Amino acid sequence: MTSAEMTSPNNNSEHQAIAKMRTMIEGFDDISHGGLPIGRSTLVSGTSGTGKTLFSIQFLYNGIIEFDEPGVFVTFEETPQDIIKNARSFGWDLAKLVDEGKLFILDASPDPEGQEVVGGFDLSALIERINYAIQKYRARRVSIDSVTSVFQQYDASSVVRRELFRLVARLKQIGATTVMTTERIEEYGPIARYGVEEFVSDNVVILRNVLEGERRRRTLEILKLRGTSHMKGEYPFTITDHGINIFPLGAMRLTQRSSNVRVSSGVVRLDEMCGGGFFKDSIILATGATGTGKTLLVSRFVENACANKERAILFAYEESRAQLLRNAYSWGMDFEEMERQNLLKIVCAYPESAGLEDHLQIIKSEINDFKPARIAIDSLSALARGVSNNAFRQFVIGVTGYAKQEEITGLFTNTSDQFMGAHSITDSHISTITDTIILLQYVEIRGEMSRAINVFKMRGSWHDKAIREFMISDKGPDIKDSFRNFERIISGSPTRITVDEKSELSRIVRGVQEKGPES
């Protein structure tokens, strides 16, 4: 099967669509609606270090490995030896492909001893060399890295532009699908440094590496794919050991199946409050101030999975593995034994150790390798530090979307800013994404500090509306009765309600009579 078979136009369609060539770059074919237009040139533009050369090499490598389509790589910057050496870090053996006649690297890099142009500048010789290589190797894919170097080597930009037009026209005449890289000065400035490169190409892809808050965030944007459709806007990506990995969040569809099967939270009373437990493929958010018992709920959640011989992964971003093991053991949970049985995996990392896209990739990789039935993230708020609201929301969408796709039950925690009193759950930008929200908070009752728990929201199920007392003992969580004689608990200012004892006794008797004798 060729790279164009699944994206070729329908012969019966009224309008002839443009066939596309799949790049097999993770996520790119989704946002480009099938890949790059066949027989056309695509300009990949970005500042230094954004991954332009990597994109151009991966485009060729995937074509050779996945579809047995030979390629030609034209380098104006690095030597072929450097390119082959750098590609090895991604597990790509370009030297072997060269020896097998599947890849040809055309060295047009500058002479280290300098060069002097005598007479008029043209690319006729280079064009003929490229043409010869394409014909000899029957190449369908061509990458040129980079156009900027041509401008830097020669001063006459108008002449260089003319020659680039000639080069692109010749490649189009041959029918090669071409990727050309160019450098830009600013992340959100002109598309290319010399302002003419984008007019030479049919398509433009922009790579960015923007500093947001305290972290850098890589994004890819398809600015244009002439004559064909594509998804608009920026999409986050990361560079892994296997190359570029784009997260096409906008391409995600709400097509996952919904299950009526319930799973236990690990706390019997909480299961009762949720109408019998969490739905199997749901995402639960436990939110509250520090110390309200969120990590304890997470621990019970993963312990229950292991007790039922199901696998679980705990992603911890606030506590070390040793601390998690110690705290769990103090509540009667032996996480080490669960790990030995290969039922539990604990992944600990500082949020600042990587960007959100890198953390998302790690989470997806761990899920793919370990195949858990449940995951827990403690906590999302730690990952939100130093990043924009949009980047954080995209991260949460990526995690929840992947968990639902794999039919995994997920319990995430979020630490609220306010120690007591009401706090807006919607400020975290994740309340609408999750299926169930458990609200934990501190309340002051009769001069003493107490904890309260409430099932704030649960999609598709009845749930208890009461605000109940939540106690933590050496045996773990213990949910008591509701604060029946108090109101305004969520606001942080509980007020005692005067209760007429006779009326209250009548209410209790009436409730018992309505319930009737147990069968």
UniProtKB/Swiss-Prot annotation:
Single Gene Ontology MF annotation: magnesium ion binding
Loss of function: phenotype: Not essential for growth on low light, loss of circadian cycle and rhythmicity. Loss of rhythmic chromosome compaction. No visible phenotype during growth in a light/dark regime for 5-7 days (at 150 umol photons/m(2)/s). Accumulates much larger amounts of primary metabolites (especially those in and connected to the oxidative pentose phosphate pathway) in 4 hours after dark-light transition. Glycogen accumulates 4-5 hours earlier than normal, overall levels are higher, no change in glycogen degradation kinetics.
PROSITE patterns: KAIC (PS51146)
Effect of mutating A422T: In kaiC15; able to suppress the kaiA2 extended phenotype
Residues annotated to bind ATP 2: 290-296, 331, 451, 457-459, 461, 463, 465
Co-factor binding comment: Binds 2 Mg(2+) ions per subunit, one in each domain. Mg(2+) is required for hexamerization and phosphatase activity.
Catalytic activity field: L-seryl-[protein] + ATP = O-phospho-L-seryl-[protein] + ADP + H(+); L-threonyl-[protein] + ATP = O-phospho-L-threonyl-[protein] + ADP + H(+); ATP + H2O = ADP + phosphate + H(+)
Temperature-related properties: ATPase activity is stable from 25 to 35 degrees Celsius.
Residue positions binding Mg(2+) 2: T295, E318
Active site: E77 (proton acceptor in ci (kaic 1)), E318 (proton acceptor in cii (kaic 2))
Record note on quaternary structure: Homohexamer resembling 2 stacked donuts with a central pore nearly blocked on one side; hexamerization is dependent on ATP-binding. Binds 12 ATP; 6 between each subunit in both layers. KaiB only binds to phospho-Ser-431 KaiC (not doubly phosphorylated KaiC). Complex formation between KaiB and KaiC is regulated by the phosphorylation state of KaiC and by an ATP hydrolysis-driven conformation change in the CI ring of KaiC; complex formation is slow. Slow complex formation is crucial for the timing of the circadian period.
Entry's family note: Belongs to the KaiC family.
Remarks, miscellaneous: 'Kai' means 'cycle' in Japanese.
Domain notes: In the homohexamer the 2 domains (called CI and CII, joined by a linker) self-associate to each form a 'donut' layer; the compactness and local conformation of the domains varies over the cell cycle and impacts function. CII has the autokinase and autophosphatase activities, both CI and CII have (weak) ATPase activity; CI has the clock pacemaker role. The CI ring undergoes structural changes driven by ATP hydrolysis that together with the KaiC phosphorylation state regulate KaiB binding. In the homohexamer the 2 domains (called CI and CII) self-associate to each form a 'donut' layer; the compactness and local conformation of the domains varies over the cell cycle and impacts function. CII has the autokinase and autophosphatase activities, both CI and CII have (weak) ATPase activity; CI has the clock pacemaker role.
Protein name: Circadian clock oscillator protein KaiC
Provenance organism: Synechococcus elongatus (strain ATCC 33912 / PCC 7942 / FACHB-805) (Anacystis nidulans R2)
Gene: kaiC
